[in-house]
Amino acid sequence: MKYIELAQLYQKLEKTTMKLIKTRLVADFLKRVPEDHLDFIPYLILGDVFPEWDERELGVGEKLLIKAVSMATGVDPKEIENSVKDTGDLGESIALAIKRRKQKSFFSQPLTIKRVYQTLVKIAETTGEGSQEKKMKYLANLFMDAEPLEAKYLARTVLGTMRTGVAEGLLRDAIALAFHVKVELVERAYMLTSDFGFVAKIAKAEGNEGLEKVTIQLGKPIKPMLAQQAANIKEALLEMGGEAEFEIKYDGARVQVHKDGEKVIIYSRRLENVTRAIPEIVEAIKEAIEPEKVIVEGELVAIGEEGRPLPFQYVLRRFRRKHNIEEMMKKIPLELNLFDVLYVDGKSFVDTKFIERRKKLEEIVKPNGKIKVAENLITKNAEEAEKFYKRALEMGHEGLMAKRLDAVYEPGNRGKKWLKIKPTMENLDLVIIGAEWGEGRRAHLFGSFILGAYDPETGEFLEVGKVGSGFTDDDLVEFTKMLKPLIVKEEGKRVVIQPKIVIEVTYQEIQKSPKYRSGFALRFPRYVALRDDKGPEDADTIERIAQLYELQERIKGKV
């Protein structure tokens, strides 16, 4: 299958904002895809190369990409860089450079999707001495044979800046439409495997019957079940039917552990492989968990000198560390508090009641210094739960989780079967979708940032406010440096930013607002932290903001 066909799809997707049209375009394309291409083409359509849980990265920045194009075309790198000032898009500028190419090689052949994909895999797997030079040559070979339109979208794929408006929800619907299968079965299969390529192949080859049989696969992370927030203990008990399991809500980073004999893989909430960053937890898991094949979930907490929990940002520092890991192990010791089990020796526990999963977890885990089972209380008594809540807060934890005893595990769902109970309203994780230049001595820096909430159905990020407080001067320097390469266009003092960076904000309240398409605005938002453990699709959604607004109004009504 020729790459120009995929490039033409990207072009059509970029030209329409209509979700139904985009879905039909992707579905029609998928129908024509050969079966042996289906395991990777869904990722290329999303603008990626690999699933989010795959460790491989291309490791190609703008400068290396421009050098590769220069090698392929003979156009000076500075000319390509200067062109971006006019086009506002490196992909467009590279397409122009390809048009200026003197001539194609005598041995030139049309690009195929398979060749492009295999070359990108080769680039990701090229490491060590001289790797940058090799990557540049691999890319140059592709650009030598590329048409301008192909070059534009190949460049965007390499940089991860596709911008065609195709998100997970749209791809899910397109797979269902293309292969005449139920959308809820595509959704379920994807939530269990986090692998659109695998799901698309099953949908085409085996239809609804095949999708119904899809189950957990060791080594492929399951989308985590999420919780809403309750106003208080009484509301949580009422929602749970009068009795619930309460467990400590730790201020850490959620992880999913896959153990297959001596092999252990640990995924973050974002489903990134963080195994190498936390070797002591890997070893502790091998000692603490007896069965050979297991998937468990827990909260990874950083522990301070007096044994009290440190803020979750300390865990993120451990995740980010690539070198001197042993030194970081001493500086920031970790503890894993397990709270769920999803798979044991060939049996899935996803459709098992929570109370039975909890018992199984306690059966298979032998706590040690690094691995514990989350402390819990099963009760019908609100006063007893209040005492447990108070003790959790005194110990330095965030609050409690309330879990319905008969609840099955619902991958990717944020329902009311799990509820958070915290003393404050939940902070929000939002995406920076724009920025405004500062004034005076800060005129060369961004001074405030436009916040967007995610709409998973359309893949859009809808504005919910602007944040300018909570940043230090150093923060503004860092954010300006981080966001400048992501500028899509400038409109006076305001710039439109490609949605890539997630930040955590606090706020005084959520208000309904006709000013924004989202329908909501944050009153007095304040920056708390950079959430580089989350991708834009992991940001809080419009639906989540609506839920928090309702919770806020309920709390007001009870004051």
Swiss-Prot record:
It catalyses: ATP + (deoxyribonucleotide)n-3'-hydroxyl + 5'-phospho-(deoxyribonucleotide)m = (deoxyribonucleotide)n+m + AMP + diphosphate. The active site is at K249 (n6-amp-lysine intermediate). Its EC number is 6.5.1.1. DNA ligase that seals nicks in double-stranded DNA during DNA replication, DNA recombination and DNA repair. ATP binds at E247, R254, R269, E299, F339, R414, K420. PROSITE patterns: DNA_LIGASE_A1, DNA_LIGASE_A2, DNA_LIGASE_A3. It comes from Pyrococcus horikoshii (strain ATCC 700860 / DSM 12428 / JCM 9974 / NBRC 100139 / OT-3). PANTHER family: DNA LIGASE (PTHR45674:SF7), DNA LIGASE 1/3 FAMILY MEMBER (PTHR45674). The lineage of its organism: Archaea, Methanobacteriati, Methanobacteriota, Thermococci, Thermococcales. One of its GO terms (biological process) is DNA recombination. It is an enzyme of class 6 (ligase). Keywords: ATP-binding, Cell cycle, Cell division, DNA damage, DNA recombination, DNA repair, DNA replication, Ligase, Magnesium, Metal-binding, Nucleotide-binding. The keyword Metal-binding applies. This is DNA ligase. Pfam families: DNA_ligase_A_C (PF04679), DNA_ligase_A_M (PF01068), DNA_ligase_A_N (PF04675). Belongs to the ATP-dependent DNA ligase family. One of its GO terms (molecular function) is ATP binding. Its cofactor is Mg(2+). InterPro entries: ATP-dep_DNA_ligase, DNA_ligae_ATP-dep_bac/arc, DNA_ligase_ATP-dep, DNA_ligase_ATP-dep_C, DNA_ligase_ATP-dep_cent, DNA_ligase_ATP-dep_CS, DNA_ligase_ATP-dep_N, DNA_ligase_N_sf.
